[in-house]
Amino acid sequence: MVSFGGLARKIFGSSNDRRVKTLRQRAEQITALEKNYENLTDEQLQAKTAEFRAALAEGKSLDSLLPDAFATAREAAKRVLGMRPFDVQLIGGMVLHERGIAEMRTGEGKTLMATLPVYLNALEGKGVHVVTVNDYLATRDAETMGRLYNFLGLTVGVIKHGLDDDERRAAYACDITYGTNNELGFDYLRDNMKYERAQMVQRPHNYAIVDEVDSILIDEARTPLIISGPLEDRSDFYNLIDTFIPPLAEEDYEVDEKQKTAIFTEVGTEKVEKLLEAAGHLKGESLYDIENVAVVHHLNNALRAHKLFQRDKDYIVRNDEIVIIDEFTGRMMPGRRYSEGLHQALEAKEHVTIQPENQTLASITFQNYFRMYNKLSGMTGTAATEAEEFGNIYGLEVLEIPTNLPVQRIDEDDEVYRTVEEKYRAIVRDIRASHEKGQPILVGTTSIEKSEQLAERLRREGIKGFQVLNARYHEQEAYIIAQAGVPGAVTIATNMAGRGTDIQLGGNLEMRVRQELSDVPEGPEREEKIAAIKADIAQLKEKALAAGGLYVLATERHESRRIDNQLRGRSGRQGDPGRSKFFLSLQDDLMRIFGSDRMDGMLQKLGLKEDEAIVHPWINKALEKAQKKVEARNFEIRKNLLKYDDVMNDQRKVIFEQRLEMMDEEDLTETVAEMRHEVIEDMVILRIPKDAYAEKWDIAGLKQDIASKLNLDLPVEEWAKEEGIAEEEFENRIKEAADKAAAEKAERFGPQIMTYVEKSVIMQSLDNLWREHLVNLDHLRSVVGFRGYAQRDPLNEYKTEAFELFQTMLANLREVVISQLMRVEIVREAPPEPQLPPMAGLHIDGTTGENDFDEAIWAEHQHDDRIVPPAQRDPADPRTWGKVSRNEPCPCGSGKKYKHCHGAFE
């Protein structure tokens, strides 16, 4: 029975269909211009860029230029790349220009499609970023598509690992910049740790097109980019805690795979308490006393490391390091580390060198980084299942772009077996049958461990010539995946490894030329060999087509339908035939976690025998229902995390904007005066509360504050004895004295040096306090969840307390800055050590018995204003001190070493 909604869609079409229809009409208008542009010479076509830029300067909009700009880019692509964007690619290009996400099937030409909106938006000269998932794709696309942009007079840069700041600055200054999401995000964080605007590498965030947008904005949304610095080494402690976990019995802990949590039971808590007590690490009477918060945190991390994280699935051990594996792509993520001690717990578990824990210096999530762009769009093969999330969080509408040719892939129903062993036997049988008839096969697995187990089975069964593509062999990824379409090829791949590289039936011409002709120079011989490779690929393609096209065989369903759809989408590109099938067992993670017990009972009642599978559309629907539940739960988690991160993000914006303002300021006198006055007001109100009786005044405390925060000695005791004096008069007198001292210092330093000193002190203090604030916010976030048990909203509690922490940080900033500026003095560099005659230091005056060594030096350097004899130093005037050795007693008379007194502020 057709629902009313279904009936309406049949009559009127879906909103997606109606939108595509409108855009198709615009695409036809662009195609109508094609003849005119074909008749232009190269020079006339190239001149269009200057023509469009002049029109923009006169006030025309990008939208008004779109038809002609797209027609120009299409004609340039035909001439430079030998490729003509189809009308569906024009439609996709318009979606990208209009802040949308273009869902385009694998092999339909997303990379070429992106050149149209990239060219149009680059005309403004504000910078366009094309974001990809790895350095290989960024470099490949920048080189290939760069030829098109260069032909049209635009500059192209690429951001990749290993570039220095000058190279990065040059790449960002280009009209078009290709780079990975990680590199762009880290450059933003590093820029906001710089002290001069000239040192920064990025321009303001104008327009970004994110390739594989679902991977970056959904799968990686929960992973923050963190720049951190090392703390003290605590490897012995991690190793000790790790020894407590292996002896535990199942009754000692509970693991919830659905929620991905592991906790100690009451029995387990008692056991580890005894172990900690024996090791001398238990403070107080109970493990959960406040003094043991850090110990509990490390114990929980050790339990998670052992019971939730699996080697070769979640991470691998390589070169004495734990390398995280991306759960969505199966790729290694070198350089990425779990935070808050979890990575160290994994290192202890695997007995590799434990790296020191890190303190966060700066962090941002991809969600908040990409929301900074004035205009954002994306493209992928699979986004429709996450359309709600893209709309809610990023304000991006997903549009499914029709394929240029009808899809001929056959998606078969899942085969469900009772055990993993039965499932793998069926997979091997199916691979053998397809391999023998010459059909190329892509086998999708969910982890490195499972891909290698399957490879071992194929070896035992005598199936040869297969390739394993997983995080261990990341370097060969593109080549292996490009050749997966050769007849009879068997490629075992973890999840979406090789994403971004097409699987072309018969093989990939570009890859084969690169591999086979790398040492053959340009010329007739090379052309002849390329022609031979083309003919060979065409012949192999015919064989692959005759065998049924690419067969995607999946060994397990993923939690997300989108990941399954990505795998399916590798087959049937550009109208080619193909097929896909999922092999499942009731022992698979998804089935086991989401209620396979009922299904197992049902299959037993049906009398399912060993090695028999059940195949029915109902099972597919039941699995999709389970996946939808997981997706909805993950969306809620990401949405909730974003609400918390938005609190920090608002504070981050304020701090980073303040830093930028500081960089641009040429005179900070007023800013510093305001800070100084606020510090004085806070100081006075604390010690002399408004309307309080004189007996309640803390004059001794006020005097101490003035000395420690303002470096002044004021007669506040005398002022307090005056008749009728109130807190306002105290404030005014202290401000007047502090302003006078600051003005004298500014006159001594000169305006240029004073501004430099003020800027340095403010920015360094701001950075240090911001780092401490990030740690405080992390701690607050880790405990605020428990407020829910007291019927209080954890998010509101977090917002309130995070704001209070922020206010405290700003108050501390004022105090630290003013305290340092009131003490700072310029000390000129000491001259080179004087060359003294031998034994000069032992020459003692026979009359007085004093060593005249010091006097000899002063005599020799009496015209050098950097060295002042101790006798001529005025303790109250640092200007008379000259160069003071750091280990010398401080000339102020405090009794401390210089480096611990006035020298601390140099």
UniProtKB/Swiss-Prot annotation:
Residues 868-887 are annotated as: Disordered. Its main location: membrane. Keywords: ATP-binding, Cell inner membrane, Cell membrane, Cytoplasm, Membrane, Metal-binding, Nucleotide-binding, Protein transport, Translocase, Translocation, Transport, Zinc. Zn(2+) binds at C890, C892, C901, H902. It holds the Pfam family SecA_PP_bind. The keyword Transmembrane does not apply. Transmembrane segments: none annotated. It catalyses: ATP + H2O + cellular proteinSide 1 = ADP + phosphate + cellular proteinSide 2. It is a peripheral membrane protein. InterPro entries: Helicase_ATP-bd, Helicase_C-like, P-loop_NTPase, SEC_C_motif, SecA, SecA_CS, SecA_DEAD, SecA_motor_DEAD. It is found in: Cell inner membrane; Cytoplasm. Gene3D superfamilies: 3.10.450.50, Helical scaffold and wing domains of SecA (1.10.3060.10), P-loop containing nucleotide triphosphate hydrolases (3.40.50.300), SecA, preprotein cross-linking domain (3.90.1440.10). It is an enzyme of class 7 (translocase). GO terms for molecular function: ATP binding; metal ion binding; protein-exporting ATPase activity. GO terms for cellular component: cell envelope Sec protein transport complex; cytosol; plasma membrane. The keyword Translocase applies. HAMAP family: SecA. Part of the Sec protein translocase complex. Interacts with the SecYEG preprotein conducting channel. Has a central role in coupling the hydrolysis of ATP to the transfer of proteins into and across the cell membrane, serving both as a receptor for the preprotein-SecB complex and as an ATP-driven molecular motor driving the stepwise translocation of polypeptide chains across the membrane. Belongs to the SecA family. Monomer and homodimer. Part of the essential Sec protein translocation apparatus which comprises SecA, SecYEG and auxiliary proteins SecDF-YajC and YidC. This is Protein translocase subunit SecA. It comes from Brucella abortus (strain 2308). The lineage of its organism: Bacteria, Pseudomonadati, Pseudomonadota, Alphaproteobacteria, Hyphomicrobiales. The gene is secA.
